[in-house]
A protein has these predicted regions:
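Membrane-helix and juxtamembrane interface regions of eukaryotic multi-pass membrane proteins
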Residues: 1-75
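Hydrophobic transmembrane alpha-helices
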Residues: 25-32, 36, 79, 101-200
Length: 200
């Protein structure tokens, strides 16, 4: 952390870093003319469900007293604001008129996507729980988890998040959502590989 300069409490940093995308999406949805159309409204709820958990629940489940570099937090804020704008603008403003009708909710892509979304969310939440319960109080050593999805992949939490966003992209067929999938992969895959190499 010292090489990154100023830092903040990790829990506070997570809230400040993740909450902007929740708020940006809320603002864009509320000011759109399609906010209560069934499909856009459901897209909004799914997106916000993820980020409510990530912004306002996940940070307070963290253990330990680590700190987050201020620079990392600010970079996260910028990315999340831009991502929120990209996702919300497409879903509520730029999508072709008549694309997201009620009939969208009966398409195969919607149902496949929503199944993937909740499978990914379940994997992500369970994997986070496994990590939180790895160490006993006072133990500062690092361990590679062996439960749940960790039996098959090195970073079950990252895998779950990637599956979740693939599901969101499939259920919306949104170009913006697919861009986010690519970014998520580009961000998480190297981190997962680094963890794998560390414990090899």
């Amino acid at each position: 952390t010292p090489k990154w300069g100023l830092s903040v409490n990790n829990k506070l940093g997570w809230v400040l870093m993740e909450a902007p995308v929740f708020l940006v999406m809320l603002y864009l949805w509320w000011n759109s003319s399609v906010r209560f159309d069934a499909a856009p409204f459901l897209f909004f709820l799914l997106f916000e469900l993820h980020y409510f958990q990530r912004s306002f629940l996940f940070p307070f489940l963290m253990k330990g007293k680590s700190r987050m570099p201020l620079a990392i937090m600010l970079m996260g804020v910028v990315f999340n604001v831009l991502n929120g704008l990209m996702q919300g603008e497409w879903l509520f403003y730029l999508a072709p008129e008549g694309l997201y009708t009620d009939a969208w909710l009966s398409t195969p892509s919607f149902w496949l996507g929503i199944i993937l979304f909740f499978i990914g969310m379940g994997i992500n939440l369970h994997s986070d729980s496994v990590i939180r319960h790895l160490r006993k109080p006072g133990d500062t050593r690092h361990y590679l988890p062996q439960k749940g999805m960790y039996r098959y992949v090195t970073s079950g939490n990252y895998f779950g998040e990637l599956v979740e966003w693939i599901g969101f992209a499939v259920l919306t067929c949104s170009p913006a959502a697919w861009v986010f999938v690519l970014w998520t992969f580009a961000n998480l895959a190297p981190r997962a590989n680094s963890i794998r190499n560390r414990y090899r």
